[in-house]
Amino acid sequence: KKHLDETGKTMLAEAEQNIRSIGKIHEILYRQQNISRLSAKEYFGDLADEIKRGYSGHFVDIRIEGDIQIAVEQAIYCGIIINELVTNALKYAFDENGGRIDIKLSETGGQKSMTVADNGRGYDVDAPITSFGLSLVQKLTEDELKGSISSTSKDGITHILRWS
């Protein structure tokens, strides 16, 4: 009988969470009449609650401001991105005092914007990306959403994603 090491367990848990994020899209679509677009605020709120339940320990407040309507195809990629960024913040950004994660959504002239910011300990955003999660976020943003991502580290980490 083979046992997973810690890395394997972590990867499996993250894959399970990504699958649950896609399931959340289906739940929201069943509750509404328009099945081609959905409220990002509702979806990300449900998703953030689900992710938070998986991380006990310190208290983290997750707030969502604004709303945009996104196509189902975009929602799948955005859900995985939110999952990765929120999970990273929950795992690495905060000490025993907890903290806050803010997700801001807006759209101007067809350009959508999603900001995910935490008030945690931060890291060097200019260093080469070595984590699978952040590499996935960058790849999905650029290749699938045909957008861009920028990150800054001041009083925590802020990721700003833009796409059409």
Where are these regions (language model features)?
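Short beta-to-alpha transition helix within the HATPase_c
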Residues: 12-20, 24, 36-53
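Acidic ATP/Mg2+-coordinating residue in the GHKL
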Residues: 118
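Glycine-rich nucleotide-binding loop
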Residues: 100, 122, 154-160
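Conserved short alpha-helical segment within the C-terminal cytosolic histidine kinase catalytic core
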Residues: 25, 29, 46-58, 136, ...
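ATP phosphate-binding glycine-rich loop and adjacent ATP-lid/helix-beta elements
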Residues: 125-152
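Conserved short strand/loop->alpha-helix "switch" segment adjacent to the catalytic nucleotide/phosphoryl-transfer site
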Residues: 55-86, 90-100
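Short acidic helix/loop segment immediately C-terminal to the autophosphorylated histidine
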Residues: 1-11, 33-34
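Short beta-strand/loop element within the Bergerat-fold HATPase_c
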Residues: 98-110
